[in-house]
Amino acid sequence: MPSYGSLHSPSLRKMEHSRGQYGGGRKGMSLGNVIGDPFALATISIAGLAWLIAFIASIVAQIQTTQGFPTYTWWTVVFYFFLIPGVFVVVASDTIQTYHVALVGYMACGLVLTTSSVNGLVYSTNGAKEAAAAGFILLSMVTIVWIFYFGSAPSAMPRAYLDSFALSKESTSNNRQTMTGGGYGIGRPETSTSVQPPQMYTSAQLNGFENPSPVNGMRNSGAPPSGFPTTPGPASGLPKTTTPPAGGAADAEIVPPTEYPYRAKAIYTYEANPDDANEISFSKHEILEVSDVSGRWWQARKETGETGIAPSNYLILL
Protein backbone atom coordinates (compact mmCIF):
# COMPACT_ATOMS: atom_id res chain seq x y z
CA MET A 1 0.00 0.00 0.00
CA PRO A 2 1.52 3.38 -0.97
CA SER A 3 2.58 5.52 2.00
CA TYR A 4 1.25 9.00 2.63
CA GLY A 5 2.45 11.44 -0.01
CA SER A 6 3.99 8.83 -2.29
CA LEU A 7 4.35 10.10 -5.82
CA HIS A 8 2.74 6.90 -7.10
CA SER A 9 -0.16 7.17 -4.67
CA PRO A 10 -3.62 6.96 -6.27
CA SER A 11 -4.59 10.11 -4.38
CA LEU A 12 -1.84 12.18 -5.97
CA ARG A 13 -2.75 10.78 -9.37
CA LYS A 14 -6.31 11.90 -8.80
CA MET A 15 -5.18 15.38 -7.77
CA GLU A 16 -2.73 15.79 -10.66
CA HIS A 17 -5.10 14.53 -13.35
CA SER A 18 -8.31 16.12 -12.06
CA ARG A 19 -8.48 18.53 -14.98
CA GLY A 20 -8.21 15.75 -17.54
CA GLN A 21 -10.70 13.52 -15.77
CA TYR A 22 -13.31 16.20 -15.22
CA GLY A 23 -15.93 15.62 -17.84
CA GLY A 24 -13.85 12.87 -19.36
CA GLY A 25 -16.72 10.41 -19.64
CA ARG A 26 -20.31 10.90 -20.66
CA LYS A 27 -23.01 9.51 -18.46
CA GLY A 28 -26.11 7.90 -19.85
CA MET A 29 -29.61 8.67 -18.72
CA SER A 30 -30.85 6.87 -15.65
CA LEU A 31 -34.41 6.96 -14.38
CA GLY A 32 -33.03 6.35 -10.91
CA ASN A 33 -31.58 9.87 -10.86
CA VAL A 34 -35.14 11.22 -10.99
CA ILE A 35 -36.89 8.61 -8.87
CA GLY A 36 -34.18 8.75 -6.22
CA ASP A 37 -34.38 12.55 -5.97
CA PRO A 38 -37.60 13.56 -4.13
CA PHE A 39 -37.28 17.20 -5.16
CA ALA A 40 -36.87 16.45 -8.86
CA LEU A 41 -39.58 13.78 -8.82
CA ALA A 42 -42.10 16.03 -7.06
CA THR A 43 -41.51 19.18 -9.11
CA ILE A 44 -41.42 17.41 -12.48
CA SER A 45 -44.59 15.49 -11.63
CA ILE A 46 -46.42 18.63 -10.49
CA ALA A 47 -45.27 20.52 -13.58
CA GLY A 48 -46.45 17.72 -15.86
CA LEU A 49 -49.84 17.59 -14.15
CA ALA A 50 -50.20 21.39 -14.29
CA TRP A 51 -49.32 21.40 -18.00
CA LEU A 52 -51.91 18.70 -18.68
CA ILE A 53 -54.60 20.70 -16.86
CA ALA A 54 -53.71 23.87 -18.74
CA PHE A 55 -53.60 22.05 -22.09
CA ILE A 56 -56.98 20.31 -21.75
CA ALA A 57 -58.67 23.38 -20.28
CA SER A 58 -57.31 25.55 -23.09
CA ILE A 59 -58.76 23.19 -25.70
CA VAL A 60 -62.19 23.31 -24.02
CA ALA A 61 -62.03 27.08 -23.63
CA GLN A 62 -61.06 27.51 -27.29
CA ILE A 63 -64.10 25.45 -28.34
CA GLN A 64 -66.52 27.21 -26.00
CA THR A 65 -65.32 30.73 -26.79
CA THR A 66 -64.39 31.18 -30.42
CA GLN A 67 -63.47 34.79 -29.74
CA GLY A 68 -61.68 36.36 -26.83
CA PHE A 69 -59.31 33.46 -26.10
CA PRO A 70 -55.70 34.72 -25.82
CA THR A 71 -53.83 33.03 -28.64
CA TYR A 72 -50.38 33.46 -27.04
CA THR A 73 -51.55 30.94 -24.43
CA TRP A 74 -50.91 28.23 -27.00
CA TRP A 75 -47.30 29.35 -27.31
CA THR A 76 -47.00 28.94 -23.53
CA VAL A 77 -48.37 25.41 -23.79
CA VAL A 78 -45.92 24.53 -26.58
CA PHE A 79 -42.99 26.14 -24.74
CA TYR A 80 -43.55 24.05 -21.61
CA PHE A 81 -44.15 20.97 -23.74
CA PHE A 82 -40.40 21.09 -24.46
CA LEU A 83 -39.19 22.68 -21.20
CA ILE A 84 -40.54 20.05 -18.80
CA PRO A 85 -39.03 17.08 -20.72
CA GLY A 86 -35.81 19.07 -20.99
CA VAL A 87 -35.60 19.35 -17.21
CA PHE A 88 -36.32 15.63 -16.94
CA VAL A 89 -33.51 14.75 -19.36
CA VAL A 90 -30.98 16.99 -17.60
CA VAL A 91 -31.77 15.51 -14.18
CA ALA A 92 -31.88 11.93 -15.48
CA SER A 93 -28.50 12.31 -17.20
CA ASP A 94 -26.98 14.00 -14.11
CA THR A 95 -25.78 17.02 -16.13
CA ILE A 96 -27.31 19.79 -14.02
CA GLN A 97 -23.97 21.52 -13.54
CA THR A 98 -23.45 21.57 -17.30
CA TYR A 99 -26.80 23.00 -18.39
CA HIS A 100 -28.04 24.88 -15.32
CA VAL A 101 -27.38 28.30 -16.88
CA ALA A 102 -29.39 27.44 -20.00
CA LEU A 103 -32.19 25.98 -17.89
CA VAL A 104 -32.48 29.13 -15.79
CA GLY A 105 -32.68 31.26 -18.94
CA TYR A 106 -35.44 29.16 -20.47
CA MET A 107 -37.31 29.06 -17.17
CA ALA A 108 -37.19 32.84 -16.89
CA CYS A 109 -38.80 33.10 -20.33
CA GLY A 110 -41.37 30.50 -19.33
CA LEU A 111 -42.25 32.42 -16.18
CA VAL A 112 -43.06 35.48 -18.28
CA LEU A 113 -45.30 33.39 -20.56
CA THR A 114 -47.20 31.68 -17.74
CA THR A 115 -47.84 34.88 -15.81
CA SER A 116 -49.06 36.60 -18.99
CA SER A 117 -51.38 33.67 -19.69
CA VAL A 118 -52.73 33.81 -16.14
CA ASN A 119 -53.43 37.52 -16.52
CA GLY A 120 -55.44 36.88 -19.70
CA LEU A 121 -57.49 33.98 -18.32
CA VAL A 122 -58.01 34.32 -14.59
CA TYR A 123 -60.52 37.21 -14.77
CA SER A 124 -62.88 35.35 -17.11
CA THR A 125 -66.22 33.92 -15.96
CA ASN A 126 -65.76 30.89 -18.19
CA GLY A 127 -64.94 27.76 -16.17
CA ALA A 128 -62.55 26.34 -18.75
CA LYS A 129 -60.53 29.55 -18.81
CA GLU A 130 -60.35 29.57 -15.02
CA ALA A 131 -59.16 25.96 -15.04
CA ALA A 132 -56.48 26.85 -17.59
CA ALA A 133 -55.45 29.80 -15.42
CA ALA A 134 -55.12 27.45 -12.43
CA GLY A 135 -52.83 25.19 -14.44
CA PHE A 136 -50.64 28.13 -15.49
CA ILE A 137 -50.52 29.41 -11.90
CA LEU A 138 -49.23 26.02 -10.77
CA LEU A 139 -46.67 26.05 -13.58
CA SER A 140 -45.53 29.51 -12.48
CA MET A 141 -45.02 28.33 -8.91
CA VAL A 142 -42.95 25.33 -10.01
CA THR A 143 -40.91 27.54 -12.35
CA ILE A 144 -40.07 29.96 -9.52
CA VAL A 145 -38.83 27.06 -7.38
CA TRP A 146 -36.82 25.69 -10.30
CA ILE A 147 -35.14 29.04 -10.97
CA PHE A 148 -34.07 29.27 -7.33
CA TYR A 149 -32.77 25.68 -7.27
CA PHE A 150 -30.95 25.56 -10.60
CA GLY A 151 -29.69 29.13 -10.22
CA SER A 152 -28.05 28.42 -6.85
CA ALA A 153 -24.56 27.01 -6.39
CA PRO A 154 -24.33 23.38 -5.24
CA SER A 155 -22.76 24.58 -1.99
CA ALA A 156 -25.74 26.83 -1.16
CA MET A 157 -27.38 25.67 2.04
CA PRO A 158 -30.97 25.32 0.67
CA ARG A 159 -29.81 23.35 -2.35
CA ALA A 160 -27.43 21.21 -0.32
CA TYR A 161 -30.30 20.42 2.05
CA LEU A 162 -32.55 19.35 -0.83
CA ASP A 163 -29.77 17.30 -2.41
CA SER A 164 -29.20 15.48 0.88
CA PHE A 165 -32.47 13.59 0.34
CA ALA A 166 -31.40 12.27 -3.07
CA LEU A 167 -30.64 8.55 -2.89
CA SER A 168 -28.56 8.55 -6.07
CA LYS A 169 -26.17 11.15 -4.66
CA GLU A 170 -25.83 9.26 -1.37
CA SER A 171 -25.07 5.95 -3.10
CA THR A 172 -22.27 7.43 -5.22
CA SER A 173 -19.70 6.83 -2.49
CA ASN A 174 -20.66 3.15 -2.37
CA ASN A 175 -20.23 2.63 -6.12
CA ARG A 176 -16.73 4.11 -6.35
CA GLN A 177 -15.17 0.99 -4.82
CA THR A 178 -15.73 -0.82 -8.13
CA MET A 179 -13.48 1.64 -9.98
CA THR A 180 -9.82 0.86 -10.65
CA GLY A 181 -6.85 2.47 -12.36
CA GLY A 182 -7.58 5.80 -14.07
CA GLY A 183 -11.30 5.60 -13.49
CA TYR A 184 -11.28 7.54 -10.25
CA GLY A 185 -13.87 10.25 -10.07
CA ILE A 186 -15.99 9.07 -13.03
CA GLY A 187 -18.91 8.02 -10.86
CA ARG A 188 -18.69 10.92 -8.42
CA PRO A 189 -20.93 13.99 -8.53
CA GLU A 190 -19.41 16.60 -10.79
CA THR A 191 -18.35 19.99 -9.57
CA SER A 192 -17.70 23.24 -11.36
CA THR A 193 -14.37 23.75 -9.56
CA SER A 194 -11.35 22.34 -11.37
CA VAL A 195 -8.13 24.10 -10.39
CA GLN A 196 -4.67 22.69 -10.87
CA PRO A 197 -3.26 21.68 -7.44
CA PRO A 198 -0.20 23.53 -6.13
CA GLN A 199 3.26 22.24 -6.97
CA MET A 200 4.64 19.86 -4.36
CA TYR A 201 8.35 19.17 -3.80
CA THR A 202 10.06 16.10 -2.43
CA SER A 203 12.85 16.04 0.10
CA ALA A 204 15.25 14.92 -2.63
CA GLN A 205 14.45 17.99 -4.71
CA LEU A 206 14.98 20.31 -1.72
CA ASN A 207 18.24 18.68 -0.63
CA GLY A 208 21.03 21.25 -0.27
CA PHE A 209 18.78 24.23 0.43
CA GLU A 210 18.77 23.69 4.19
CA ASN A 211 20.88 25.95 6.42
CA PRO A 212 22.35 23.85 9.26
CA SER A 213 24.00 26.83 11.01
CA PRO A 214 22.06 29.28 13.18
CA VAL A 215 21.69 32.78 11.82
CA ASN A 216 23.40 34.41 14.81
CA GLY A 217 26.34 32.04 14.57
CA MET A 218 26.92 33.03 10.98
CA ARG A 219 26.91 36.73 11.84
CA ASN A 220 29.42 36.40 14.71
CA SER A 221 31.79 34.08 12.93
CA GLY A 222 34.54 35.44 10.75
CA ALA A 223 34.27 32.56 8.37
CA PRO A 224 32.46 33.16 5.12
CA PRO A 225 29.01 31.67 4.61
CA SER A 226 28.90 27.99 3.89
CA GLY A 227 27.43 28.63 0.46
CA PHE A 228 30.64 30.32 -0.84
CA PRO A 229 33.96 28.56 -1.61
CA THR A 230 37.00 29.43 0.55
CA THR A 231 39.62 28.19 -1.88
CA PRO A 232 39.64 27.99 -5.63
CA GLY A 233 38.36 24.75 -6.86
CA PRO A 234 35.56 23.18 -8.79
CA ALA A 235 32.42 24.01 -6.81
CA SER A 236 34.20 23.49 -3.46
CA GLY A 237 31.55 25.27 -1.35
CA LEU A 238 28.42 24.61 -3.37
CA PRO A 239 25.70 22.63 -1.64
CA LYS A 240 25.86 18.99 -2.38
CA THR A 241 22.95 17.37 -4.07
CA THR A 242 22.17 13.73 -4.23
CA THR A 243 20.72 12.10 -7.28
CA PRO A 244 18.17 9.57 -6.11
CA PRO A 245 18.52 6.11 -7.57
CA ALA A 246 16.08 4.77 -10.10
CA GLY A 247 12.76 4.28 -8.41
CA GLY A 248 13.83 6.29 -5.36
CA ALA A 249 11.69 9.29 -6.26
CA ALA A 250 8.66 7.07 -6.43
CA ASP A 251 8.88 6.39 -2.70
CA ALA A 252 9.78 9.94 -1.65
CA GLU A 253 7.60 11.26 1.11
CA ILE A 254 5.76 14.60 1.08
CA VAL A 255 5.34 16.23 4.46
CA PRO A 256 1.63 16.84 5.17
CA PRO A 257 0.55 20.42 5.85
CA THR A 258 0.56 21.69 9.42
CA GLU A 259 -1.91 24.56 9.02
CA TYR A 260 -5.61 24.11 8.34
CA PRO A 261 -7.07 27.63 8.05
CA TYR A 262 -10.44 26.58 6.58
CA ARG A 263 -13.39 24.76 8.09
CA ALA A 264 -15.79 22.68 6.01
CA LYS A 265 -18.98 20.76 6.71
CA ALA A 266 -19.76 17.41 5.11
CA ILE A 267 -23.03 17.43 3.16
CA TYR A 268 -22.80 13.70 2.34
CA THR A 269 -21.38 10.62 4.01
CA TYR A 270 -18.14 9.43 2.40
CA GLU A 271 -16.37 6.09 2.78
CA ALA A 272 -12.66 6.12 1.99
CA ASN A 273 -11.31 3.88 -0.74
CA PRO A 274 -9.76 0.86 1.02
CA ASP A 275 -7.05 0.71 -1.68
CA ASP A 276 -5.91 4.28 -0.97
CA ALA A 277 -4.46 4.99 2.47
CA ASN A 278 -4.52 8.76 1.86
CA GLU A 279 -8.32 9.10 1.78
CA ILE A 280 -10.34 9.67 4.93
CA SER A 281 -13.90 8.71 5.75
CA PHE A 282 -16.39 11.11 7.29
CA SER A 283 -20.06 11.20 8.12
CA LYS A 284 -22.73 13.65 7.06
CA HIS A 285 -22.68 17.03 8.88
CA GLU A 286 -19.19 16.31 10.28
CA ILE A 287 -16.89 19.35 10.59
CA LEU A 288 -13.43 19.08 9.00
CA GLU A 289 -10.41 21.38 8.93
CA VAL A 290 -9.05 22.04 5.43
CA SER A 291 -5.59 23.28 4.47
CA ASP A 292 -6.07 23.96 0.74
CA VAL A 293 -9.34 24.51 -1.15
CA SER A 294 -7.94 24.33 -4.68
CA GLY A 295 -8.74 21.37 -6.89
CA ARG A 296 -11.29 18.59 -6.57
CA TRP A 297 -9.51 16.90 -3.63
CA TRP A 298 -8.89 18.85 -0.43
CA GLN A 299 -6.34 18.09 2.27
CA ALA A 300 -8.44 17.77 5.43
CA ARG A 301 -8.10 16.89 9.11
CA LYS A 302 -10.81 15.43 11.32
CA GLU A 303 -11.47 16.37 14.93
CA THR A 304 -9.78 13.14 15.98
CA GLY A 305 -6.55 14.30 14.32
CA GLU A 306 -6.79 11.94 11.36
CA THR A 307 -5.58 13.59 8.14
CA GLY A 308 -6.02 12.78 4.47
CA ILE A 309 -7.72 13.95 1.31
CA ALA A 310 -11.46 14.37 0.82
CA PRO A 311 -13.55 15.08 -2.31
CA SER A 312 -14.47 18.76 -2.46
CA ASN A 313 -17.96 18.09 -3.81
CA TYR A 314 -18.84 16.36 -0.54
CA LEU A 315 -17.95 19.45 1.52
CA ILE A 316 -19.07 23.06 1.88
CA LEU A 317 -16.93 25.79 3.41
CA LEU A 318 -18.17 27.42 6.60
Swiss-Prot record:
Subunit record text: Forms homooligomers.
Cellular localization per UniProt: Cell membrane
Database matches in CDD domains: SH3_Sho1p
Induction: Expression is significantly reduced when PMK1 is disrupted.
Keywords associated with the record: Cell membrane, Membrane, SH3 domain, Stress response, Transmembrane, Transmembrane helix, Virulence
Family affiliation: Belongs to the SHO1 family.
Keyword Cell membrane applies: yes
Annotated Polar residues bias: 190-214
TM regions (residue ranges): 39-59, 72-92, 101-121, 131-151
Compositional bias per record (Low complexity), positions renumbered to this chain: 237-250
InterPro entries (alphabetical): SH3-like_dom_sf (IPR036028), SH3_domain (IPR001452), Sho1_SH3 (IPR035522)
Known role: MSB2 and SHO1 have overlapping functions in recognizing various surface signals for MAPK PMK1 activation and appressorium formation. While MSB2 is critical for sensing surface hydrophobicity and cutin monomers, SHO1 may play a more important role in recognizing rice leaf waxes.
UniProt note: phenotype after gene disruption: Reduces only slightly appressorium formation and virulence.
Protein name, UniProt field: Cell surface sensor SHO1
Domain SH3: 259-318
Signal keyword on record: no
Cited Pfam families: SH3_1
Extracellular topology ranges: 60-71, 122-130
Gene Ontology CC entries for this record: plasma membrane
Start and end residues of each stretch annotated as Disordered: 1-23, 172-255
Membrane topology reported for the UniProt record: Multi-pass membrane protein
Cytoplasmic side: 1-38, 93-100, 152-318
